[in-house]
């Protein structure tokens, strides 16, 4: 079982879209998946067809504030092999509420470790959807994860933001999670008609080499529509370009397995 965070400090890069479609793609290949929505916006929650306005105690917030155990708040989605721990806006208050706890960066890791040790959980992957910023919740995810998937928007300034993220990851490795590694970088919102997308791709591949997935995720209307219907695009419209790309990405992700221990 692996814990993988999908992360980028910049918003609007396809992070949540990648979480829910990777989760759906893996579940279609008979992998058992738990998604943890660690973003107070709750977009992964609604994108998988659940409500993000329920009682906060029944969300990841209830676990992190000590009210609930993970086993008590896992919810079934409408999709086979795919469960979720939901989120809502109350999660945004956690940083202030835990200000006096010197070990707060480890809260999620401690809760996950207890759950995995004490339960019969048989998930193949736990996927964490991180907030689009570097805050306590993001640090909790980085501390808890085995590896990271980084969506990279194929647009101007994207690589600059990625460089900042790499520095953050290195700091976390030095002080909090030395085993953390980058599983891969996924180019998103790619427009093959646009020279800029091709330029960003070339620069990313030149700099990060085989850390960049072969698959690229295109700009696609159906990909944008699917979350409003509470389902991954792989189910909403499995024949659209966005779906085909995420199916390909899922295959590439699974085929990485023998190489997982490589350093970031």
Q: Model-predicted segments: where are they?
A:
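P-loop NTP-binding core
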Residues: 1-264
């Amino acid at each position: 079982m692996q814990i993988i965070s999908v992360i980028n400090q910049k918003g609007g890069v396809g992070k949540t879209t990648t979480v829910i479609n990777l989760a759906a793609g893996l579940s279609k290949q008979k992998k058992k998946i738990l998604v943890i929505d660690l973003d107070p916006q709750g977009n992964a929650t609604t994108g998988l067809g659940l409500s993000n306005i329920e009682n906060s105690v029944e969300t990841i917030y209830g676990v992190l504030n000590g009210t609930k155990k993970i086993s008590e708040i896992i919810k079934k989605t409408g999709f086979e092999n795919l469960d979720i721990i939901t989120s809502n806006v109350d999660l945004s208050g956690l940083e202030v509420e835990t200000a006096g706890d010197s070990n707060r960066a480890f809260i999620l890791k401690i809760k996950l470790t207890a759950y995995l040790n004490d339960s019969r959980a048989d998930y193949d992957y736990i996927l964490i959807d991180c907030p689009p910023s570097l805050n306590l919740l993001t640090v909790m995810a980085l501390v808890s994860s085995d590896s990271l998937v980084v969506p990279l928007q194929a647009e101007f300034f994207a690589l600059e933001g990625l460089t900042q993220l790499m520095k953050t990851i290195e700091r976390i490795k030095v002080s909090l999670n030395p085993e953390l590694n980058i599983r891969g970088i996924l180019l998103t919102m790619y427009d093959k008609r646009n020279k800029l997308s091709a330029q960003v791709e070339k620069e990313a591949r030149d700099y990060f080499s085989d850390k960049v997935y072969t698959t690229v995720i295109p700009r696609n209307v159906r990909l944008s529509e699917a979350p409003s219907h509470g389902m991954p695009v792989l189910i909403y419209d499995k024949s659209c370009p966005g779906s085909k790309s995420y199916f390909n990405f899922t295959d590439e992700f699974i085929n990485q397995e023998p190489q997982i221990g490589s350093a970031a």
